[in-house]
């Protein structure tokens, strides 16, 4: 658990290895990060339990990809250990729909490699939970936001009168401010907020206070729920629909765990509530264009590595395609990057398998951080002597060593957790008295001569500088995405590519230990286009990249360059920008974790990667399911006349495979019939 310190974790692992502990809880991410012997030593595994197994096919396909990789990892583990252990998967909310696109049960069985298996099906109905679902009214002259604030505040007053309540709000950002607009100051002491970024001590205190009745209401994101066992919650209120209907059923199921209590799931619904759902969906979304770029990059790396069937691909190789905000905490940024890239590669693997059969491309479940490079510029002899068993000098490069990171950690820094080891390694604080930093080996292929590359970049940066300067002084820094069209057309780049280039160049940088951004963007009203706002200082940054290109990019077309630099340095970003301009290809080894990729059919990979029109069916299906979820909530919340019994029947119909059209036919009719009788 993340609540334990590194020392506490190591003590737990020791107790498991020594046979003092027989039941051991850990996350899929932790299981996939280490050799199994690190946890259990020489002991045999008797049983693996996958609790909340619906997360395998929900979280696993979106934001915690190691859940999806769990099954193949367990299968590989059985092969490596030479014996079989049973796997027991449990969930209260999985959709049974073997012929539909939203099946979760058989998808989970497939993902976890459970077949053949015994399948036990219970009921989703909770007879002691009723519903209070109304249509939110917006009064004359009132905005949606004001109406929502008034409605939730009235609910809060009711909930404070003798109830224990969870209020679910979709966004962590601003949740504390919202809380204060919903609750009178005199009642603030009865209410607490709960979301993922609160520290573990705060979370524990909030849960304990809620359990003991010192807090009557928790305003929470979906982070509150799993693993929290409080039996006397009697109200669950949703400010807006959950991310999925399955999430909604999970969340209302936290009410009335004590069967002697009557719980109520409440919502005041308005059509504009779907804004929250859509914003959450788009926040971490991967586009078809990005998937196409990542697939193309896999093909380019395959060629650069001599068409090797098995390759390690650094997360940095794909950084240009996803454009995540840079963070001061490099490990957090790396973790975000890992989730997005592994998810994208998983979707590509699934799609190619679906289209062509077999496994044209196979992604390894584990992210490796076994070997890498460290640069120590002072030439400290004592440092070299102390760690020579784990470090080999790189020939021809002064002060750079190839390092067996895992062996170094296990033998010299095992008192630290692996995450803390990586943090200090990244920050140059691992080796006492020595400034030794992690660097990545950047292997660069010039697709044009260095002179042509530098000229092309300089010309583009000058055109951008002219646009940004005019915008800054003539239009309060604002310009539209269409303004980029004519500039980037000369470099064979369309508007989406132009947006990616300029935001990578100017957005979310870390300078002198702080996050800075020279550009922001927002959607134009009633248009699916962006309006950008640029701030002062961009010209110095453009000049810096132009000079860096002239200094470091040398040689003829087809030449190779080798750089050892930190993963998120200016040179690394320059190479990403040049890659977007299609004037270099490059790969990174070491510095950041890598993903193993095995190519079983290079012809299929080439065909799809170079087609220029790749469309990923997994993403298409995800989008279809998302739209169906909106329709599902619209039907469930919009029909305010449904009785509690009918709502639970609706839920059971959905979980046992009735499709959206069937639900519409059955429950629209139910409402109409009831209205007719009235």
Please identify what each model-predicted range represents.
Residues 28, 52, 171:
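Walker B catalytic acidic pair
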Residues 141, 155-224, 228-678:
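C-terminal helicase lobe
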């Amino acid at each position: 658990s993340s609540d334990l310190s590194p020392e506490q974790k190591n003590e737990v692992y020791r107790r498991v290895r020594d046979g003092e502990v027989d039941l051991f809880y850990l996350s899929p991410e932790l299981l996939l990060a280490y050799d199994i012997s690190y946890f259990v030593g020489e002991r045999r595994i008797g049983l693996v339990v996958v609790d909340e197994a619906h997360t395998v096919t929900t979280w696993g396909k979106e934001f915690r990809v190691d859940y999806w990789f769990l099954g193949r990892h367990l299968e590989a583990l059985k092969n490596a250990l030479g014996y079989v252990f049973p796997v027991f998967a449990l969930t209260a909310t999985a959709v049974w729909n073997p012929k539909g696109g939203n099946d979760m049960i058989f998808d989970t069985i497939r993902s976890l490699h459970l077949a053949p298996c015994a399948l036990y099906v219970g009921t989703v109905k909770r007879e002691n939970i009723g519903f209070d679902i109304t249509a939110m009214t917006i009064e004359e002259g009132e905005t949606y936001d004001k109406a929502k604030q008034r409605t939730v505040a009235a609910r809060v007053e009711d909930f404070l009168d003798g109830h224990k309540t969870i209020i679910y709000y979709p966004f962590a950002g601003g949740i504390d401010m919202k809380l204060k607009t919903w609750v009178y100051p005199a009642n603030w002491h009865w209410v607490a907020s709960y979301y993922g970024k609160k520290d573990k001590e705060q979370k524990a205190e909030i849960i304990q206070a809620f359990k003991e009745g010192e807090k009557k209401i928790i305003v929470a994101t979906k982070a509150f729920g799993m693993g929290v066992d409080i039996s006397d919650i009697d109200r669950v209120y949703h400010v807006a629909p959950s991310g999925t209907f399955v999430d909604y059923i999970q969340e209302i199921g936290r009410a009335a765990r004590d069967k002697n209590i009557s719980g109520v799931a409440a919502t005041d619904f308005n059509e504009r509530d779907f804004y929250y759902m859509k914003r959450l969906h788009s926040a971490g979304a991967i586009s078809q264009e990005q998937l196409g770029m990542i697939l193309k990059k896999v093909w380019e790396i395959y060629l650069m590595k001599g068409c090797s069937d098995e390759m390690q691909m650094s997360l940095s190789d794909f950084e240009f395609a996803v454009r995540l905000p840079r963070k001061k905490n490099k490990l957090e940024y790396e973790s975000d990057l890992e989730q997005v890239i592994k998810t994208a590669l998983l979707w590509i693997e699934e799609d190619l398998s679906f289209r062509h059969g077999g496994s044209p491309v196979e992604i390894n479940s584990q992210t490796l951080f076994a070997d890498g490079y460290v640069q120590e510029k002072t030439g400290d002899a004592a440092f070299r002597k102390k760690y020579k068993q784990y470090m080999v000098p790189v020939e021809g490069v002064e002060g750079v060593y190839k390092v067996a990171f895992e062996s170094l950690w296990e033998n010299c820094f095992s008192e630290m957790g692996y995450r803390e080891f990586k943090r200090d390694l990244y920050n140059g604080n691992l080796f006492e008295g020595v400034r030794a930093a992690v660097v990545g080996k950047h292997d660069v292929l010039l697709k044009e001569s260095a002179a042509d590359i530098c000229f092309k970049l300089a010309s583009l940066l000058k055109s951008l500088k002219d646009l940004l300067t005019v915008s800054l002084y003539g239009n309060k820094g604002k310009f539209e995405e269409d303004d980029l069209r004519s500039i980037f057309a000369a470099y064979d780049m369309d508007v989406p590519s132009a947006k990616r280039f300029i935001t990578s160049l100017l957005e979310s940088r870390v300078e002198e230990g702080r996050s800075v951004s020279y550009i922001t963007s927002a959607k134009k009203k009633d248009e699916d286009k962006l309006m950008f706002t640029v701030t002062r200082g961009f010209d110095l940054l453009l000049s810096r990249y132009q000079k860096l290109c002239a200094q470091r990019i040398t040689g003829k077309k087809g030449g190779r360059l080798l750089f050892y630099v930190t993963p998120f340095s200016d040179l690394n970003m320059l190479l990403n920008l040049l890659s977007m301009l299609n004037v270099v290809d490059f790969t990174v080894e070491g510095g950041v974790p890598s993903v193993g990729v095995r190519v079983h059919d290079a012809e299929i990979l080439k065909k799809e990667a170079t087609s220029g029109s790749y469309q990923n069916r997994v993403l298409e299906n995800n989008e279809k399911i998302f739209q169906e979820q909106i329709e599902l909530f619209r039907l469930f919340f919009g029909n305010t006349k449904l009785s509690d019994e009918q709502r639970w029947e609706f839920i059971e119909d959905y979980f046992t495979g009735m499709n959206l059209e069937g639900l519409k036919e059955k429950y629209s009719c139910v409402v109409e019939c009831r209205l007719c009788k009235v």
